[in-house]
């Protein structure tokens, strides 16, 4: 028998063997393999938990009840002067957002469960955000952010922040507020007021600025936000107090006992509250809350209805005069303008709250006329005729191009 090439008879064949693995390396490989298996198992478990959480959310209705649509930002609106007479171009049955309901060519309105971003030119829906399982407590628009506060299980604590121009969601959170709340929009913050608490959050990101709980046996009557802080009236059994807190800082500035249930009416030009039993306006010092009567606003009988209609949460309507002095305007059946010393600068007839724009005050003086009043004197500087007339009082006027948005029981655009 012939031998294979390269091997002679009697020579042993050569066998290649793998080098021995160092014990330390073998141990490392074993431990690494075990760790990778554990890591993979953890990832698989997390993925499974995520799937189960999503399924649970849908099964409990937390996601399936949410719907919405976004839109591109509308084109910019040229700035113009309001015409002497304007006609109704569109109307929406939506309630207007609190704060400033028109921003960047979008009008924000809402019904029981849906927030709408309407095209300011046409009134058509550009974007919407809806929850079919919850009802809206409040909607606000300020600084290009729309805040929707929903009632879930009896608490107004589900909050969503939206980009006003597009309807895109910016942030969402659950508040700690219990029960129903009322809300108001001040510059950069949102104020929510419940029966036993006052809460201030940042409107850009929804983060807490502060949350104040009334002392035991006390309830919150009203809170007014302004540049000098948040002025809060409380009732504690038979005792009444006024409390001043910082607008954005978690700071108690003072708390004073007052003889009667005073109604906060000023928090920017000065700190003021009204005694409903006498109609007298009281001014309180910013440092200690020292009380100084400022004069009678009106006879108590003339203020009863307007005071009863004031919201529990409100923001001061303020600005500056041509001289750079602080200005604050309040509507209680008619307009009252306050000076920084706590006195009344002027008053004027009006059918609804005013809007302060630069050096002017815009207000509906009757159902068919909006006047531009000089902020320093209250004298009419211009008038705009509305056609057709408004159905009643309570409307606020906002400029848009050459026209006016009237926001009240509904939304009406006049151009």
What is the role of each PLM region?
Residues 155-161, 166-168, 172, 197, ...:
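Extended, amphipathic alpha-helical coiled-coil scaffold segments used for oligomerization/tethering
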Residues 1-11:
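N-terminal acidic, proline/glycine-rich, low-complexity intrinsically disordered segments
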Residues 189-208, 294, 298:
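Contiguous N-terminal and early-domain "leader" segments and peripheral loops that mark the onset or edge
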Residues 30-67, 93-111, 135-159, 176-198, ...:
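Repeat-blade elements of multi-bladed beta-propeller folds
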Residues 119-122, 163-167, 202-206, 246-250, ...:
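Short loop/turn segments that connect beta-strands within beta-propeller blades
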Residues 203-220, 232-233:
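Short, flexible helix-coil linker/hinge segments at the edges of structured domains or between repeats
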Residues 2-3, 15-40, 53-105, 113-114, ...:
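Aromatic (tryptophan-biased) beta-strands that constitute blades/sheets of beta-rich domains
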């Amino acid at each position: 028998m012939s031998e294979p090439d390269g091997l002679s008879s009697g020579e042993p064949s050569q066998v290649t063997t793998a080098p021995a693995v160092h014990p330390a390396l073998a141990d490392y490989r074993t431990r690494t393999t075990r760790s990778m298996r554990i890591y993979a198992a953890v990832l698989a478990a997390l993925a499974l938990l995520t799937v189960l959480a999503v399924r649970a959310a849908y099964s409990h209705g937390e996601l399936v009840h949410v719907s919405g649509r976004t839109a591109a930002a509308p084109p910019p609106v040229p700035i113009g002067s309001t015409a002497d007479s304007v006609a109704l171009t569109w109307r929406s049955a939506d309630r207007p957002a609190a704060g400033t309901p028109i921003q960047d060519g979008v009008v924000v309105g809402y019904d029981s469960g849906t927030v709408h971003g309407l095209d300011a030119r046409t009134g058509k829906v550009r974007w919407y955000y809806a929850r079919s399982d919850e009802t809206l407590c409040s909607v606000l628009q300020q600084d290009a952010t729309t805040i929707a506060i929903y009632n879930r299980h009896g608490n107004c604590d589900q909050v969503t922040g939206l980009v006003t121009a597009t309807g895109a969601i910016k942030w969402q959170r659950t508040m700690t507020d219990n029960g129903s709340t009322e809300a108001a929009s001040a510059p950069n913050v949102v104020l929510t007021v419940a029966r036993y608490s006052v809460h201030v959050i940042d409107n850009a990101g929804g983060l807490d600025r502060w949350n104040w709980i009334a002392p035991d046996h006390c309830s919150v009557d009203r809170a007014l936000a302004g540049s000098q802080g948040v002025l809060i009236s409380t009732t504690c059994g038979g005792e009444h107090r006024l409390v001043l807190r910082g607008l954005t800082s978690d700071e108690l500035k003072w708390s004073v006992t007052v003889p009667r249930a005073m109604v906060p009416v000023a928090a920017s030009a000065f700190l003021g509250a009204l005694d409903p039993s006498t109609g007298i306006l009281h001014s309180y010092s910013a440092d200690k809350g020292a009380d100084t009567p400022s004069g009678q606003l009106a006879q108590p009988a003339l203020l009863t209805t307007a005071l009863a209609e004031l919201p529990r949460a409100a923001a001061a309507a303020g600005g500056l005069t041509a001289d750079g002095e602080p200005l604050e305007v309040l509507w209680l059946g008619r307009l009252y303008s306050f000076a920084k010393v706590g006195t009344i600068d002027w008053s004027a007839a009006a059918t609804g709250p005013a809007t302060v724009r630069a050096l002017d005050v815009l207000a509906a003086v009757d159902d068919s006329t909006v006047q531009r009043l000089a902020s320093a004197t209250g004298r009419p500087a211009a008038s705009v005729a509305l056609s057709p007339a408004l159905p009643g009082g309570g409307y606020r006027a906002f400029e848009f191009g050459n026209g006016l948005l009237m926001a009240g029981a509904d939304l009406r655009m006049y151009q």
